[in-house]
Amino acid sequence: MLMSKLADVFKNHKVFIPFIVADDPDFETTVKNVVALAKGGADIVELGIPFSDPVADGPVIQAADLRAFAANVRTKTVFDIVEAARKETAVPIVFLTYLNIVFKYGYDAFLKRCADLNVAGLVIPDLPYESRDEIVPIAEKYGIDIIPLITPTSGHRIEKIAKSASGFIYVVSSMGITGERDEFFAGLKALVAEIKQYTNVPTAIGFGIHTPEQAQTMAGIADGVIIGSAIVDLVAKEKQQAPAAIEKFTKQIRVAVDAKKQISVK
């Protein structure tokens, strides 16, 4: 397998990964939002491909998907957004997508297009571990990481998921769907410690984080922090003025995350 571009991002510092939905509220604003996140200090940008049945997502992200559908989003639109953003930023990008989107486009064609645009990885919430072999070999051919999710209920599956991981591991902070919350799984630190027994692949915690204080706490537990709903909510409120607002928010999170001791991922 090719060396992971994403794992390299985690070397020597804590990583911040903001999430936005592609084509929300429109094409041009999404391109500007990606650039704004990079300017604000994002290490990796997670770009959601809208889907009609997003089982992992809460109401904020579901509403963003609906706004994107109203803007007539297609999978090609998402690739075109990345192509336009690439004229202004080289920030690593990962897609959050559901398996049917990739399947309908064609695994090889989808992953080749990702490689052409320097999309470094895919997060696929509805990809069962047992089915990963239908896509991972093709992803490896193009040097793209299929980023696994580990949840508080992964249990005995943690070892095999961790040992087969590449890029980074998306650690789900609590059960349920995405969305802002004030309480997280009490065993999160122990969960990350267990993952670390099996792999040197970095971990990033997501689901529910929405304040600099929470981000700082999570950066003390894992190698990176993922924030989605709080940023998507800003996009909903600010619409075409969102780039300035999310750049400001990203800078605040960057400061909070950087306050944690720098680490070196082996």
Curated annotation (Swiss-Prot):
The keyword Amino-acid biosynthesis applies. One of its GO terms (molecular function) is tryptophan synthase activity. Signal peptide: none annotated. Keywords: Amino-acid biosynthesis, Aromatic amino acid biosynthesis, Lyase, Tryptophan biosynthesis. One of its GO terms (cellular component) is cytosol. InterPro entries: Aldolase_TIM, RibuloseP-bd_barrel, Trp_synthase_alpha_AS, Trp_synthase_suA. It catalyses: (1S,2R)-1-C-(indol-3-yl)glycerol 3-phosphate + L-serine = D-glyceraldehyde 3-phosphate + L-tryptophan + H2O. The active site is at E46, D57. It is an enzyme of class 4 (lyase). Its EC number is 4.2.1.20. It comes from the Bacteria. Pathway: Amino-acid biosynthesis; L-tryptophan biosynthesis; L-tryptophan from chorismate: step 5/5. The alpha subunit is responsible for the aldol cleavage of indoleglycerol phosphate to indole and glyceraldehyde 3-phosphate. PANTHER family: TRYPTOPHAN SYNTHASE ALPHA CHAIN, CHLOROPLASTIC, TRYPTOPHAN SYNTHASE, ALPHA CHAIN. Belongs to the TrpA family. Tetramer of two alpha and two beta chains. This is Tryptophan synthase alpha chain. The lineage of its organism: Bacteria, Bacillati, Bacillota, Bacilli, Lactobacillales.
